[in-house]
Amino acid sequence: MTELSPKYNPAEVEAGRYQKWLDADVFKPSGDQKAKPYSIVIPPPNVTGKLHLGHAWDTTLQDIIIRQKRMQGFDTLWLPGMDHAGIATQAKVEERLRGQGITRYDLGREKFLDKVWEWKDEYATTIKEQWGKMGLSVDYSRERFTLDEGLSKAVRKVFVDLYKKGWIYRGEFIINWDPAARTALSDIEVIHKDVEGAFYHMNYMLEDGSRALQVATTRPETMFGDVAVAVNPEDPRYKDLIGKHVILPIVNKLIPIVGDEHADPEFGTGVVKITPAHDPNDFEVGQRHNLPQVNVMNDDGTMNELAGDFAGMDRFEARQATVAKLEELGALVNIEKRVHSVGHSERSGAVVEPRLSTQWFVKMDELAKQAMDNQETDDRVDFYPPRFNDTFLQWMENVHDWVISRQLWWGHQIPAWYNAEGEIYVGEEAPEGDGWTQDEDVLDTWFSSALWPFSTMGWPDTDVEDFKRYFPTSTLVTGYDIIFFWVSRMIFQTLEFTGRQPFQNVLIHGLIRDEEGRKMSKSLGNGIDPMDVIEKYGADSLRWFLSNGSAPGQDVRFSYEKMDASWNFINKIWNISRYILMNNEGLTLEEAESNVAKVAASEAGNVTDQWILHNLNETIAKVTENFDKFEFGVAGHILYNFIWEEFANWYVELTKEVLYSDNEAEKVITRSVLLYTLDKILRLLHPIMPFVTEEIYAQYAQGSIVTAAYPTVTPAFENEAAHKGVESLKDLIRAVRNARAEVNVAPSKPITILVKTADSELEDFFTSNVNYIKRFTNPEKLEISSAIAAPELAMTSIITGAEIYLPLADLLNVEEELARLDKELAKWQKELDMVGKKLGNERFVANAKPEVVQKEKDKQADYQAKYDATQERIAEMQKLVK
């Protein structure tokens, strides 16, 4: 056994440890066919750059789960990997090239892709280094990438199979267009923001000049693509105009007036301009009336030749020029300033342009129905918290067909080929013969990511061992911000191609926010690099903060004050471990376990040993229960309270009564309980703080704590009598300490302590453990009896089953003591009100477990006894007031 260094230094503790784990292969599946499999696939981070604090949180939660399951004897697999992140990564590489004065078009597709692969290799290395610093127990031998050959094969098969079923199709429709990235976007890649804008009201004159029809638009630059105006066929103001024509201003061409229910008589003037190539609703109107589709913009957001004098202008520049021209012509009625919702690209931030474009789509109705129906079966995906199941179902009910083609070079090139005759060939391999050209577009990144849970396991080969053993996966951990982007798509794609759910559970977490509750972003400059935090505090401190502040579905606020508290907690663990190991006298863990069994059987040890083992048992049960519910924050609070309050502040201090004695037999038992409890604490903590627990564990045990058994409840440790007795002992000691502090009596000054109790068992317990009372209260005189008369001038403390009097006549101010007792009385009244309200709730009494209801009734009786005793003491003290 070696000795821990005097001071906890996370840099020293964590240095080299991760590589030792990798060298020992402790992160790989056990291969034990008798063990139940448990698998997680990591949500693949984008190879766009370094990981942020949100990634640290996400992966910490996964590591906690997989480490605990590994210790519980499951055959665990945590499969790592990364996402090619098409549009985001391509944008980063293009930005780097622009700094060198180069565009992707200068390089050409092949050489540009070489540059992107270089970027990928660079940042994949960085990401893996960060994973190592976080201590993530992933199996690198199974690492995947969304563009590796295995996943590419799966992507091609899925595309071809859906195409053959008629669920992938190619067509010309209005889509969301990103003019900055020059690519199509799906609906959920568009972020809507309220912006200051305007409605421009314009007059379109009838062909005969008899009157004008007023229309309004937020995008007057699109008027060059107007092919009609629409009125409601039931609107009496315009019914007689249907079939006639108006003159399109500036362009001076005739366009028809059509009758269509899209025109709302109650909105505006009831007349709308129809621009089928630039508005989804207008596109539908155009389809119904067989109207032409006139696209007036280039793919970069500039106006094309159909805009006449405005050709080549940026769309926003053209907007102002168009308005000025309309005003010059007398066709502009007015400009109405208004805040309205405008779509922006989730990736580039550019204002999205609705644009007519030929794209590939996934038909969603059947896929969505399958996913929703599956949630009614035993094979459903369970969301934590459950409210996100409703979020998932609502999105599925309202989902539109998914545009999956992207006008990029980085990604899975669409497996479709065209020839001069206009034929389309879709297949997993290129068609035979000459004259075929592959579609230049690539698939939406989320198309390949949607296959992640099963493609990483070897699919489409369903006979490989990983697929048979580890699919479906057990748990997915991810943020609520990508339920639509990713979780939903994994569910419907996995169901379609495997007939199974992709994962049994989905743990949804929130976002990391700053101390003020703001979302972390580059624009606010409030982002935190997790590697900087680790450098200062260590990975274990960061992991403890991230888990301890975690509740399913909720956001977390980062603060350095909380990081200080995390470090202090680990430092406390370090110090008590060092104390225990320094006093261990060569005791082995096996010997400690044998001696602890004697304590459990009441063959050795004392009541404090039995008390800590009982509380350890309760802690193990509660922590395990909350881990199973993914309530890591609750589990963390339970661990913190047990370790700091019960173990360090009480039990370790209580053991000094034995360790500083001459009774060698008792010392061995006490050392055994200390080492045994410390060992269980380290195992409970290991999934959360792996580095420091491994460092301490190595001082007294063989092998790695990574594969040590996770603690389980030991029925023999249950000892309610010991628990009740020591809790009363703690209450007594605490009451005396508090009373000393109230009147400024130093702990070193001996005082008289009178303990009155009518409970004979409690009297016997206090009497038999008087050595502990004396050690912690420093009495000049200590009397424990049922026959004690309350002194006139004494401080009074009421604990369960006893009254404690401290005769401090020369120090006590009666009026101040009465004020203190009044506060005590108010406290007990508040507790009585709360428990009374709960017990007065018929639904609670009817639905709660009987033992829970009884616990509340016991509390009520206890609070009532304390209230009555306090009231009685107040009455006695009031007699002393002259």
From Swiss-Prot:
Q: Where is this motif: 'HIGH' region?
A: 45-55
Q: Where are the coiled-coil regions?
A: 808-882
Keywords, alphabetical: Aminoacyl-tRNA synthetase, ATP-binding, Coiled coil, Cytoplasm, Ligase, Nucleotide-binding, Protein biosynthesis
Reactions catalysed, semicolon-separated, are: tRNA(Val) + L-valine + ATP = L-valyl-tRNA(Val) + AMP + diphosphate
Ligand binding (ATP): K522
- One Gene Ontology term of the molecular function aspect: ATP binding
**Class of this enzyme:** ligase
Q: Which InterPro entries match?
A: aa-tRNA-synth_I_CS, aa-tRNA-synth_Ia, Anticodon_Ia_Val, M/V/L/I-tRNA-synth_anticd-bd, Rossmann-like_a/b/a_fold, tRNA-bd_arm, tRNAsynth_Ia_anticodon-bd, Val-tRNA_synth_C_sf
Source taxon at top rank: Bacteria
Give the function comment from the record: Catalyzes the attachment of valine to tRNA(Val). As ValRS can inadvertently accommodate and process structurally similar amino acids such as threonine, to avoid such errors, it has a 'posttransfer' editing activity that hydrolyzes mischarged Thr-tRNA(Val) in a tRNA-dependent manner.
Q: Which NCBIfam families match?
A: PRK05729.1, valS
Q: What is the name listed in the Swiss-Prot or TrEMBL entry for this protein?
A: Valine--tRNA ligase
